[in-house]
Amino acid sequence: MPETEKIAEVFEELTGSKISKNFLDHRKIFLWGPVTDESSKDLVGKLLYLEMKDPGKKITFYINSPGGVVTSGMTVFDTIKMISSPVHTVCMGMAASMGSVLLAAGTKGERSIWPNGKVMIHQPSIGGQIVAPATDLKIHAEEILKTKTKLNQILADACGHPISKLEEDTDRDYYMDAEEAIKYGIVDKLATKIDFN
């Protein structure tokens, strides 16, 4: 590798990590991409670090995610709910599927969306190919239905709707623009500026 490429790589690594550290120092965390074991580990670590460093002080959580693994997302959700620091969630771009659940997990009154943000809610699905005996398939089906009910209840509570509305709305992909998401109750307000406080 030529020397200039090495220098550029080192500069990018140092700059990127310095920017990330500055955001963390200002209690800003990001989910940019799918909810995975790796991204949830990163988020939970940052949430717990910030809680330990200064309990009860605001954390801003920016979300641009197509969703992902439910169990990974629920780890982040539970952490948000168990720490004393209020978590202000912000949808920038898209908060879909598990991303929408994390958006809704923020402190009520402090969940916002950027003007061109989108939210999508739907029922959970089983990914990949399952090769199993019929009895095990039944177990998987029962588990996904329990998960569906749990997620619908979480969103119903967060949005102030009866669970029957969520069951109907999440039967298929349900998209909302910024104004629709506010009206639905999954966020509370439109973000009109970037808050560095």
Curated annotation (Swiss-Prot):
EC number(s) stated in the UniProt entry for this protein: 3.4.21.92
Main location (coarse class): cytoplasm
Active-site residue list: S97, H122
Catalytic activity: Hydrolysis of proteins to small peptides in the presence of ATP and magnesium. alpha-casein is the usual test substrate. In the absence of ATP, only oligopeptides shorter than five residues are hydrolyzed (such as succinyl-Leu-Tyr-|-NHMec, and Leu-Tyr-Leu-|-Tyr-Trp, in which cleavage of the -Tyr-|-Leu- and -Tyr-|-Trp bonds also occurs)
Any one GO cellular component localisation term in the record: cytoplasm
GO molecular function: ATP-dependent peptidase activity; ATPase binding; serine-type endopeptidase activity
Keywords: Cytoplasm, Hydrolase, Protease, Serine protease
SUPFAM superfamilies: ClpP/crotonase
Location of the protein in the cell: Cytoplasm
Listed HAMAP family: ClpP (MF_00444)
Role, per record: Cleaves peptides in various proteins in a process that requires ATP hydrolysis. Has a chymotrypsin-like activity. Plays a major role in the degradation of misfolded proteins.
Name the record gives this protein: ATP-dependent Clp protease proteolytic subunit 2
